[in-house]
UniProtKB/Swiss-Prot annotation:
Catalytic machinery residues: E351, H382, K491
Species assigned in the record: Polaromonas naphthalenivorans (strain CJ2)
Gene that specifies this protein: pgi
Keyword line: Cytoplasm, Gluconeogenesis, Glycolysis, Isomerase
Subcellular location(s) of the protein: Cytoplasm
CC terms in the record's Gene Ontology section: cytosol
The protein's name: Glucose-6-phosphate isomerase
Family in the record: Belongs to the GPI family.
């Protein structure tokens, strides 16, 4: 029997009825007044992360109905299929096993897991590659002649490593500067090359296929710069993170670290793509990073849906997107170290769930991924928080805060924490003003994620939490969260347009593109 689409389930119909009866007019301030234990009921400890969901527009009834929706959509079975190594990336006929990259060597497997895709064999390959990569990272860390490491990659080969290196700067070794080049705009590469010397620089070329246009254009330019300035020994100063060893060798690179087709780009930070982070924080730190993520994997895999933080967050996303109609979510990390967190989440969620068809290729009659956007606090308060508090659109906000700061500057952290608490409170409480201009409607929802400290383990857990949350909403919507065909069309058209910039040929182009091309020549 064909599986019901989520909007055809009894739970979806019940959620619609509940929303129209009470959810549409739910007031979180009244909910707190009625229930002295609301904070306890809608907050949760998970590995390395505490979450307060109590300021959201949910009650026990909506949560129960969302959990019923999850069960009627087969969420548990879909989760188990991923962890069993089944080919859940249906459009590319691939397993989705990035969780293997953070499994400890002692991990045990069920007979079902061992039978599908030979998970135990894959785990052994992962450990061999991880050990080799971490040994190389320690070699680079010990090499005093290498002062600068330039990572050349884009998408998952850039956003994850860059975000994590910045976040864990407090744990980074002294004497090594990490740089990231992703954009094909030459200004970015030129800016980095102006800071480094050939004899002191290691270039990491991160491209699964070793054919990515942006990455290979930048890599070739970096190689030409290196040779033009008397750089010697390409093999020592370039390493590749790729599965295309032959192409890397042809480029002149002999040091390569690969990964597998069951690792999607936006989930590749845990693989060889994480080499920049391993160089920054060392092998022990990188293993702690993996361990934090594994702890969250186990929580997601084993916890009951009612007590499963990724599930609760993913269902909240469905509630807001499909019933309240909220089209975006603002990401507000109150940590300068997490300044690239919003950009990282943009790819993770919007590339995963920004789909308009289900797994069978059929158009969906409901909305999927929201738009994610944000800036670190307190900067965002002086930019767009005006709209969050007094604008016409309701935008759920997700705060991230760190209890203990790494720096020792007196007074700073208390002020930072006071601000994040105040913003969440102000969004909920609001303020009445007869004149209108200083009226804050309140009842604006927010989620608060709290880390005890920003460490390799807590960052790993925080990332894995978001990965699984995205899986949950994608599973409810019935989409394939692990392909990204939407990035392909523009690439194809760019290859056609590039030679036209030299030739001026506008045949077959639409009027707008033709007009712009002529002005650009």
């Amino acid at each position: 029997m064909k599986k019901l689409r989520c909007d055809q389930t009894p739970a979806w119909a019940a959620l619609n009825t509940h929303f129209n009866a009470s959810g549409r007019h739910f007031d979180v301030r009244e909910a707190f007044a009625r229930d002295a234990r609301r904070f306890e009921a809608f907050s949760q400890d998970a590995p390395h992360v505490f979450a307060d969901l109590s300021k959201n527009l949910i009650d026990a009834d909506s949560q129960a109905l969302l959990l019923a929706l999850a069960r009627q959509c087969g969420l548990e079975q879909q989760r188990d299929a991923m962890f069993a190594g089944e080919l859940i990336n249906s459009t590319e006929q691939r397993a989705v096993m990035h969780f293997l990259l953070r499994n400890p060597p002692s991990a045990q497997y069920t007979p079902a897991q061992a039978a599908i895709n030979k998970i135990a064999d894959a785990q052994a390959e992962v450990e061999v590659t991880l050990n080799a990569m971490l040994a190389y990272a320690e070699q680079v860390r010990a090499d005093a002649a290498i002062t600068d490491i330039v990572n050349i990659g884009i998408g998952g080969s850039d956003l994850g490593p860059q975000m994590a290196v910045l976040a864990l700067n407090e744990f980074a070794t002294a004497g090594k500067r990490l740089h990231f080049v992703s954009n094909i705009d030459g200004d970015e590469l030129a800016g980095v090359l102006g800071l480094v010397k050939p004899e002191n620089t290691l270039f990491l070329v991160a491209s699964k296929t070793f054919t990515t246009t942006e990455t290979m254009t930048n890599a070739r330019s970096a190689k030409a710069w290196f040779e033009a300035r008397g750089g010697q020994d390409i093999a020592r100063h370039f390493a590749a993170l790729t599965t295309n060893v032959a192409a890397a060798n042809e480029f002149g690179i002999t040091t390569t670290f690969g990964f597998w087709d069951w690792v999607g780009g936006r989930y590749s930070l845990w693989s060889a793509i994480g080499l920049p982070l391993a160089i920054a924080i060392g092998a022990a730190g990188f293993r702690e990073f993996l361990a934090g993520a594994h702890a969250m994997d186990e929580h997601f895999r084993t916890a009951a849906l009612e007590d499963n933080l990724p599930v609760r967050l993913g269902l909240l996303d469905v509630w807001y997107r499909n019933f309240h109609g909220f089209s975006s979510r603002s990401i507000a990390p109150y940590s300068s170290a997490l300044r690239r967190w919003p950009a990282y989440l943009q790819q993770l969620e919007m590339e995963s769930n920004g789909k308009r068809v289900d797994k069978d290729g059929q158009p969906l009659p409901f909305d999927t991924s929201p738009v994610l956007w944000g800036e670190p606090g307190t900067n965002g308060q002086h930019a767009y928080f005006q709209m969050l508090h007094q604008g016409t659109a309701v935008v759920p906000v997700e705060f991230v805060a760190v209890k203990r700061a790494a720096h020792g500057l007196p007074g700073h952290h208390d002020k930072l924490l006071a601000n994040v608490l105040a913003q969440a409170q102000a969004l909920m409480r609001g303020k009445k003003d007869a004149g209108g201009h200083q009226d804050f409607p309140g009842n604006r929802p927010s989620t608060f994620l709290l880390l005890e400290q920003l460490t390799p383990a807590s960052l790993g857990a925080l990332i894995a939490l978001q990965e699984h949350r995205v899986f949950v909403s994608g599973a409810i919507w019935g989409i394939n969260s692990f392909d990204q065909w939407g990035v392909e069309l523009g690439k194809v058209l760019a290859r056609d347009i590039e030679p036209r910039l030299q030739s001026g040929d506008i045949s077959g182009l639409d009027g707008s593109t033709a007009g712009l091309l002529q002005r650009l020549r």
